[in-house]
Design a protein with these regions (language model features):
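N-terminal, polar/charged subdomain of small-to-medium soluble alpha/beta proteins
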Residues: 1-96
């Protein structure tokens, strides 16, 4: 899986970059065919936004969260992404 961590309007500290990459690695347990995950971090007016764009063959998922804390934004976006993946994997299992 290719993981890209990008920041808008600020430079990402290494510990935040490592934290985001570590959290994204946890998504492999849902589907091992994940090919790419983009983590877009931005900061505007005391709001930190974390956006996750996840793709694997034939499917794309997106989650976006804004909070006052960057790590909290990453955690909440990850929770939303896990929910999307659980729902999708449940639908796949029902059809097969």
């Amino acid at each position: 899986m290719i993981i890209e961590v990008t920041a808008r309007h600020f430079n990402v500290p290494d510990y935040i970059r490592d934290y985001a990459e570590q959290e994204v690695q946890k998504l492999k347990k849902f589907n091992d065919r994940i090919t790419r995950c983009q983590v877009l971090l931005s900061h505007e007016h005391n709001q930190h936004t974390a956006e996750l764009n996840l793709s694997f063959p034939g499917q794309r998922f997106h989650s976006k969260v804004s909070t006052e804390n960057l790590t909290k934004s990453i955690d909440t976006a990850m929770t939303k992404m896990e929910h999307h993946l659980r729902k999708y994997m449940g639908k796949l299992q029902k059809h097969y």
